[in-house]
């Protein structure tokens, strides 16, 4: 099978360097891609869901001393729902690293749900790798900003990039497959994205759609674009 993209960049975005590489590998593997000795993220997701709930509940308890149990429960449910976890996973850029089977690669809605699961599985992996303190730090870094400020739903990177280009009168982003490695049953794609007047960005993923999203995310990061109209990109 093709080698996974460099995990050090992902670890830097998560905020934890893994001592046990098998934990982060498992956290990124959907059950549809678990074959032979490869373990899926299901058990880690179960654990991460509980760790996430405890850390966020503790954050809310300290941040809102006048809130009653009902308000705290509503805030907790909003922060730890799958959509919120998927947003965190997108911010971490996990879509380029997730391993899924062929049956899942073309299902965008399932992949969105998978991203939420992977966020929780990564939290579980951090907990097993380093204990509660590192897991608390990772969760706090990712979820505390959501707790303290209302926000618009995070768009996927391809949509954000296309809207950014359109708002500036630029041609739409152009995606191109530049390499394909690995066996036929588990290929890894390298995709580049280009907008006229800008340097292309490139990323890898275990499905074309995921590699395109990762390339768009790389472009957005390099040009310091958050949402169209929210922050100016390069001139």
UniProtKB/Swiss-Prot annotation:
Its cofactor is Mg(2+). Residues 156-225 form the DRBM domain. Its main location: cytoplasm. The keyword Magnesium applies. CDD domains: DSRM_RNAse_III_family, RIBOc. Keywords: Cytoplasm, Endonuclease, Hydrolase, Magnesium, Metal-binding, mRNA processing, Nuclease, RNA-binding, rRNA processing, rRNA-binding, tRNA processing. It is found in: Cytoplasm. One of its GO terms (biological process) is rRNA processing. InterPro entries: dsRBD_dom (IPR014720), RNase_III (IPR011907), RNase_III_dom (IPR000999), RNase_III_sf (IPR036389). The active site is at 49, 120. GO terms for cellular component: cytoplasm. SUPFAM superfamilies: dsRNA-binding domain-like, RNase III domain-like. PROSITE patterns: DS_RBD (PS50137), RNASE_3_1 (PS00517), RNASE_3_2 (PS50142). Digests double-stranded RNA. Involved in the processing of primary rRNA transcript to yield the immediate precursors to the large and small rRNAs (23S and 16S). Processes some mRNAs, and tRNAs when they are encoded in the rRNA operon. Processes pre-crRNA and tracrRNA of type II CRISPR loci if present in the organism. Belongs to the ribonuclease III family. This is Ribonuclease 3. It comes from Methylocella silvestris (strain DSM 15510 / CIP 108128 / LMG 27833 / NCIMB 13906 / BL2). The lineage of its organism: Bacteria, Pseudomonadati, Pseudomonadota, Alphaproteobacteria, Hyphomicrobiales. The gene is rnc.
